[in-house]
Amino acid sequence: PDIGRGLQGTTPGLSVVIPSGEIGSDPTIKVRGQIGSIDGSSTPLILLDNVEIPSIQMVNPDDVESITVLKDAASASIYGAKAAFGVVLITSKKGAKSEKVEVSYSGNFSWQNISKKMEMARVDGIQYRIDALKRAKGTLYGAFWYVDETSLERAKEWDKTWGGKLGVNDPFVYGRDWYVDASNRKFSIRTFDPYDYMIREWAPSQTHNISLSGRSGKTVFNVGLGYLDQNGLMKLAKHDDFRRWNGSIRLSTEINKYITARAGANYSKRNKRYAYATNSTTADPWLYLYRWDSTYPIGYDENGNEMRSPASEIHQANTANKENNYLSFNVGATLQITKDWKFDIDYTYAGEDQIWKKNGTKFTAADTWTSPVKRLDGNGNQIYVNNMGEVVSAGTEGAMPAYGLSYRQYTADGANPDHIRREVTNAKRHTLNITTDYNWQIN
């Protein structure tokens, strides 16, 4: 979807790495693997028609005529300290070579899926932990939800009876899927795969690029437009997508044999929407996706309430919106003083705005992190259930006191409902480049 990914593997010494699967993320570009600081935050200078741009995503792929990578010390001598870690020179198309107007279009529709699914251990994972517990001379393991040898045996029985038969919308039933011991500790014997709850099997994307170029006498022009629409893999988010609009115009005319004038403009808008739950439970939901073992419940309790989990928080989270706008104008001229001596002057104005809206969220869920509560009937009497979760009388064989999860509202760091945050960053730059070239050949 962008030039950076297209550069992968094309040039020796050029490393282009996609840092994450996050939609809309910029590729990390390194020339000869150079690192300029402890955190490795050094990147080459990116120039579009000799105009610095902050991101390679701002360039419409169909507008590119050529790309040159400067890797040696010569790049710094020409472009200064900013080019200490190399230069990526992008030259755009200038216009048609013949007296006509040319229109080109390219587009594609594609589907993305996760590159590798991390398989969660089920009952065998519980067995592994119990074996480790025995070697450590322990008898109980867990936090919020526990496992011991008794729960392991019950989990094995659950897997024989219910394994592969319950879906993501089937409730978490007391007696069948979990129980409470005499010390008021919760034990889950049902196993969950968080992948099924949080990640889409596939996500669509589309790109469209159109280019218009032409020539009239000694004047050439090129107009390019591009659009990218990419959906993320987060299943439960209200919005998880990235959109990019690019536009450019180039105009050049030869006034006489000594002077050539040029002008151009670039526009880029990038918009990313995502569930504002990045720090909703002291860490990223993607960490909690695999932090807990497979016995930690996800989905709904038997009252139809969402249970507290990274999936529930992503589902309920308000949508954050991150927007980047970039606009530049440039004018310039080339003076051909003699056949071997030319003089270039270019002026560029560039402005970039970043607007980041983050609306806090108040979460409501059955709390899987706190102590269970007794289930009582309308008269305040204890309810009893069997190992299928069915309500039975207290004297029935196998009857056990029924428990449930408390239903409450809560907030956490990073998604607090008491704020509606709007961050605006503006960067304006005026650049004047004056260069001269003289070719002198000695025989």
Stretch-by-stretch model annotation:
Residues 114-116, 186-226, 230-233, 244-324, ...:
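Flexible loop and strand-edge segments within Gram-negative outer membrane beta-barrel domains
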Residues 251-255, 324, 334-349:
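A conserved hydrophobic secondary-structure block that centers on an alpha-helix together
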Residues 106-110, 226-228, 266-268, 330, ...:
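Outer-membrane beta-barrel pore domains and translocons
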Residues 105, 223, 331, 434-436:
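Residue-level preference for non-acidic, small/hydrophobic
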Residues 3, 326-328:
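Short, solvent-exposed loop/turn segments enriched in Ser/Thr/Gly
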Residues 121, 130-194, 290-313, 372-425:
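Flexible glycine-rich, low-complexity coil/linker segments exposed to the extracellular/periplasmic environment
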Residues 1-247, 260-262:
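Short, small/polar-rich motifs associated with maturation and membrane association
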Residues 107, 129, 206-208, 341, ...:
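Polar/charged side chains located within well-ordered beta-strands of beta-rich proteins
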